[in-house]
């Protein structure tokens, strides 16, 4: 299949994501509960293309941004912005972690070995390479959701009361704190406790502003 045909084949996926990014009046950010038990250090995930578990306890003392990502989505344009965010805030201890998922519009259809080539040659394309850790593709909602996302979602209420349409929900069971779409974000503090959560409609620049405001408290310590 030629590159042109591949792009045509992927157009429905991209258009579906643009529908999800239409602006609406809704809250973009929500603070997490402060009384949840446990930390993200109790969990781990398999690094993309390395077949090895990465225990999140290796990030003790870091501020971690968890992002569920997809290659063939209008929001995939956030990848370069996340690279820039990682680079700019790395001196302040920020670590970005990406988790490919195919549950939203089937916009991560390939297997694990196809994800990095898709990013490099198709979208964002132009030789793009993420400078932050990606993990193997997996579910973030439903019966087979990754345990770390069960913890994050339980710790942080969703910014929006709108769960979505029945057509957009492909998982079971459905819970009120479920992730709605690609590129939602959770910030975890240096103690491993979730701090805040953003809707997929929040721009990376607004997320950056919120993180910088949050980091100010650590400059005085």
UniProtKB/Swiss-Prot annotation:
Cellular compartment(s): Secreted
EC identifiers of the protein: 1.11.1.9
Signal recorded as keyword: yes
Gene3D superfamilies found in the cross-reference section: Glutaredoxin
Active-site positions on this chain: 73
GO molecular function, one term: glutathione peroxidase activity
PROSITE patterns: GLUTATHIONE_PEROXID_1 (PS00460), GLUTATHIONE_PEROXID_2 (PS00763), GLUTATHIONE_PEROXID_3 (PS51355)
Entry-linked InterPro entries: Glutathione_peroxidase, GPX_AS, GPX_CS, Thioredoxin-like_sf
A Pfam family hit: GSHPx
Gene Ontology biological-process entries: response to oxidative stress
Catalytic activity: 2 glutathione + H2O2 = glutathione disulfide + 2 H2O
Residues making up the signal peptide according to the UniProt record: 1-21
Main location: secreted
Expression sites by tissue: Epididymis.
Protein's job: Protects cells and enzymes from oxidative damage, by catalyzing the reduction of hydrogen peroxide, lipid peroxides and organic hydroperoxide, by glutathione. May constitute a glutathione peroxidase-like protective system against peroxide damage in sperm membrane lipids.
Protein family: Belongs to the glutathione peroxidase family.
Name of the featured protein: Epididymal secretory glutathione peroxidase
Gene name, Swiss-Prot/TrEMBL: GPX5
């Amino acid at each position: 299949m030629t590159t042109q045909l591949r792009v045509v084949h992927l157009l429905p996926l991209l258009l579906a994501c643009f529908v999800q990014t239409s602006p609406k009046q809704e809250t973009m950010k929500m603070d997490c509960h402060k009384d949840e038990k446990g930390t993200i250090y109790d969990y781990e995930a398999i690094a993309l293309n390395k077949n090895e578990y990465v225990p999140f306890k290796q990030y003790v003392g870091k501020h971690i941004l968890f992002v569920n990502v997809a290659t063939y989505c209008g929001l995939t344009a956030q990848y370069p912005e996340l690279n820039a965010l990682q680079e700019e805030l790395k001196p302040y201890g920020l670590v970005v972690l990406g988790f490919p998922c195919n549950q939203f519009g089937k916009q991560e259809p390939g297997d694990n070995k196809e994800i990095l080539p898709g990013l490099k040659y198709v979208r964002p394309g132009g030789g793009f390479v993420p400078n932050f850790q990606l993990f193997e593709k997996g579910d973030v909602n439903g019966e087979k959701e990754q345990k770390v996302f069960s913890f994050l979602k339980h710790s942080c209420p969703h910014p929006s009361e709108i769960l979505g349409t029945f057509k957009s929900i492909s998982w079971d069971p459905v819970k009120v704190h479920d992730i709605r779409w690609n590129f939602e974000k959770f910030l975890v503090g240096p103690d491993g406790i979730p701090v805040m959560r953003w809707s997929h409609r929040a721009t990376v620049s607004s997320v950056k502003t919120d993180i910088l405001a949050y980091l100010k408290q650590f400059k005085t310590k």
